[in-house]
């Protein structure tokens, strides 16, 4: 049994299906899609459905595999907390959202359970998350800025649809310029 490689996927929790997106990644590796989906859904039952879970798949020479689960990326957490569908197109010049240090700390607590971050002090993880927030155009402050106090009225479930709408608008604007 020889180690062949490590592959990354992002799969929605508890609702993985043998779909083309998963099939294109697992097919060349010789991994049975339905078997993977069944095992993945069993391990992610306790997690809220449709949360994008990072999966590391380790393939072995005898067509077997092991996989490890990680929490969603920091960007996903920041977008959900700040209630913004996308990051800023001009990060240092345009602020699209706001999160507090307390919220950053909660994200860091969640991320500290990831295998690569075990043993790293929380303040270091917080610094990384603050850097990610700055790169996305999300301000990090002690208290919420007055212009972002209404963020709690935006439903988190609408963020993905808002993101799709923004992308469609940008595509149509690009087509109009040609």
Language-model features and meaning:
Residues 1-3, 58-59, 131:
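Solvent-exposed alpha-helices and their adjacent loops that cap or buttress functional pockets
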Residues 25-114, 126:
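Long, charge-patterned amphipathic alpha-helical coiled-coil/hairpin "stalk" segments used as oligomerization
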Residues 7-8, 64-66, 139:
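Structural motif
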Residues 1-31, 156-178:
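Intrinsically disordered, Lys/Arg-rich N-terminal extensions and targeting peptides
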Residues 5, 23, 27-30, 73, ...:
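Residue-identity detector for glycine
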Residues 14, 72, 143-146:
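Short, ordered loop/turn segments at secondary-structure junctions
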Residues 23-25, 38, 42, 81-85, ...:
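Generic preference for flexible, low-structure residues
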Residues 95-178:
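Positively charged, low-complexity, intrinsically disordered RNA-binding extensions
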